[in-house]
């Protein structure tokens, strides 16, 4: 079912989580996204994932290449003592300003969806650090924030990539050539 959804959607984020197989679905989305990123870069090397390995101390970064609606994701995760100790996921504009500080954007989103970046972004970051502190914790344990579903799914998918990098100790910045469509 996951393979069929992926082929139809042509994107990892277009794959719906299968009821009763949440972690498997989230892993599928993560791996599919990594394969898409490799294909976009023309990289046909095998992607090795050391699933379940201890996290290596360091700072791990991921950033989107393209701006969508004036913002792109920058995500930094710190691992110390084998645990995620800090998560800094955010949407940044061309001037380096956070979407959390865009008053007009926050007001409009809150009116339409009931939440806003200055609320859901810190929630996602805090929930990730908390989830990863649990025995067998995983980015998939982060709850989707109502009203910020797309951002929550992107957060989880990107957090999984950072965890995969930390399992290997690969501190090279992950660059996502995110697809931006005109509206």
Predicted features along the sequence, with ranges:
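Active-site- and interface-proximal helix/loop "cap" or "latch" segments in soluble metabolic
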Residues: 1-54, 63-183
């Amino acid at each position: 079912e996951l393979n069929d959804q992926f082929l139809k959607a042509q994107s990892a984020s277009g794959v719906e989580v299968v009821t009763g197989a949440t972690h498997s679905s989230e892993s599928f989305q993560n791996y599919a996204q990594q394969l898409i990123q490799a294909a976009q870069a023309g990289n046909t090397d095998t992607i090795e994932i050391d699933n379940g390995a201890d996290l290596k101390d360091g700072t791990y970064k991921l950033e989107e290449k393209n701006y969508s609606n004036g913002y792109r994701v920058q995500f930094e995760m710190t691992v110390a003592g084998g645990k995620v100790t800090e998560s800094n996921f955010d949407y940044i504009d061309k001037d380096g300003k956070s979407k959390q500080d865009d008053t007009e954007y926050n007001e409009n989103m809150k009116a339409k969806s009931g939440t806003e970046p200055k609320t859901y972004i810190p929630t996602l970051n805090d929930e990730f650090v908390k989830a990863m502190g649990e025995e067998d914790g995983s980015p998939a344990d982060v709850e989707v924030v109502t009203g910020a579903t797309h951002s929550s799914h992107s957060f989880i998918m990107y957090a999984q990539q950072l965890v995969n990098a930390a399992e290997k100790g690969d501190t090279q910045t992950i660059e996502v050539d995110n697809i931006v469509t005109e509206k």
